[in-house]
Amino acid sequence: MLIVLSLGGSILAKNLDSDRFLKYANVLRDISKKHTLLVITGGGEAARNYIGAARAMGADEVTCDYIGIDITRLNARLLIAALGPDGYPEIPTNYLEASKAINSGKVVVMGGVTPGQTTDAVAAILAEYLRADLLTIATSIDGVYSSDPNCDPSAVKYDKISPEKLINIVMAIEMKAGSKSPVDPVAAKIIERCKLDALVMDARDPSLLGEILGEEVAKKSPVSCGTWITARK
């Protein structure tokens, strides 16, 4: 299988802990023995801090976006270092470069690409471009809920939903002040338009990522730490 993984910076680069990078690298190395794997790293807290500083100095939003992209690529560079010889040595800066890099047989790692797009959106577009078998959004949330569980204690978690239902949930959450959607709206639209199979999962524990993508990914069976998004009945 070809898997595109959006690995949130908030879980990968938390406290810039080198041991975390090494743990994720070990898991990704194992997954790559069974699947072709391309990873997009997020910026996390470091990106938010740098962007906040830039805004405080009056920087425009495009400049802030480029700063965020730079931070995602720094996280990608650290993950490549953790992967050692199993990681593709260069960071693709566009979708064409990424499509060529996957032929290397190594774990390909990249960051953001275009201002105005989150790394979730980049991952979804890349998954569509490469006709990936699965898009995985690895985050700190254990799946998709009927509403933001941080704001609504009655929110219900889904084991599996359709892309169309995902769009409805995401747009409803995004409309509410203070609420945060588990999937970027652009990424959700990409998933819908190309009927892409996707998994949103809590990957704060790297071993969970290995268990799900290493063994259960082909079964599409319910997972306690995530939600499958599929157009299949």
Curated annotation (Swiss-Prot):
Pfam families: AA_kinase. One of its GO terms (biological process) is 'de novo' CTP biosynthetic process. One of its GO terms (molecular function) is UMP kinase activity. Inhibited by UTP. Gene3D superfamilies: Acetylglutamate kinase-like. It catalyses: UMP + ATP = UDP + ADP. InterPro entries: AceGlu_kinase-like_sf, Asp/Glu/Uridylate_kinase, Uridylate_kinase, Uridylate_kinase_arch/spir. GO terms for cellular component: cytoplasm. Pathway: Pyrimidine metabolism; CTP biosynthesis via de novo pathway; UDP from UMP (UMPK route): step 1/1. UMP binds at residues 43, 65, 113-119. The keyword Metal-binding does not apply. Keywords: ATP-binding, Cytoplasm, Kinase, Nucleotide-binding, Pyrimidine biosynthesis, Transferase. SUPFAM superfamilies: Carbamate kinase-like. It comes from the Archaea. Belongs to the UMP kinase family. Homohexamer. Catalyzes the reversible phosphorylation of UMP to UDP. PANTHER family: URIDYLATE KINASE, URIDYLATE KINASE PUMPKIN, CHLOROPLASTIC. This is Uridylate kinase. It comes from Methanosarcina acetivorans (strain ATCC 35395 / DSM 2834 / JCM 12185 / C2A).
